[in-house]
């Protein structure tokens, strides 16, 4: 993962964790947690692709890795929808910018995860 992506993740996570939304900070904390989880999962997929020998390790370690991958795609789609919803309802420009950047990053991560997973299949 390049340094721009790392800093984008860190910046967005920091800003999202500091925001207090009228809806519920508990929901936002859940989004931040899922965002971090997806980042870690995407990183592990990328590392496995970099070392193609890890495909066999990945399959042996977790026979249901395709199922896990499907669950991660469901999580990222849910998170994308949540971010879109938050973007529609927020009136604060700082929050709008943060959510737009988060949405862009999530879409990039989803695309990278698809690319990595096709290389692993």
Curated annotation (Swiss-Prot):
Write out the transmembrane intervals: none
Where is this chain's protein located in or outside the cell? Virion; Host nucleus
Q: Sorted alphabetically, which Pfam families does this protein's record hold? A: Flu_NS2
- Write down the InterPro entries for this protein, in alphabetical order: Flu_NS2
What further fact does the record state?
Average number present in a viral particle is estimated to be 130-200 molecules.
What family does this chain come from, according to its entry?
A: Belongs to the influenza viruses NEP family.
Q: What is this protein called?
A: Nuclear export protein
Q: Which organism is it from?
A: Influenza A virus (strain A/Swine/Wisconsin/1/1967 H1N1)
- Please spell out the taxonomic lineage of the organism that makes this protein: Viruses, Riboviria, Orthornavirae, Negarnaviricota, Polyploviricotina
Originating gene: NS
């Amino acid at each position: 993962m390049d340094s721009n992506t790392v800093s984008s993740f860190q910046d967005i996570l920091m800003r999202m964790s500091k925001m207090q939304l009228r809806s519920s900070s508990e929901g936002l904390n859940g989004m931040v947690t899922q965002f971090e989880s997806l980042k870690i999962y995407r990183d592990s997929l990328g590392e496995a692709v970099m070392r193609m020998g890890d495909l066999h390790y990945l399959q042996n370690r977790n026979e249901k890795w395709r199922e896990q991958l499907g669950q991660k795609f469901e999580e990222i789609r849910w998170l994308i929808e949540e971010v879109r919803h938050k973007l529609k309802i927020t009136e604060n420009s700082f929050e709008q910018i943060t959510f737009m950047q988060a949405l862009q990053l999530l879409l990039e991560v989803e695309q990278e995860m698809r690319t990595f997973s096709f290389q692993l299949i």
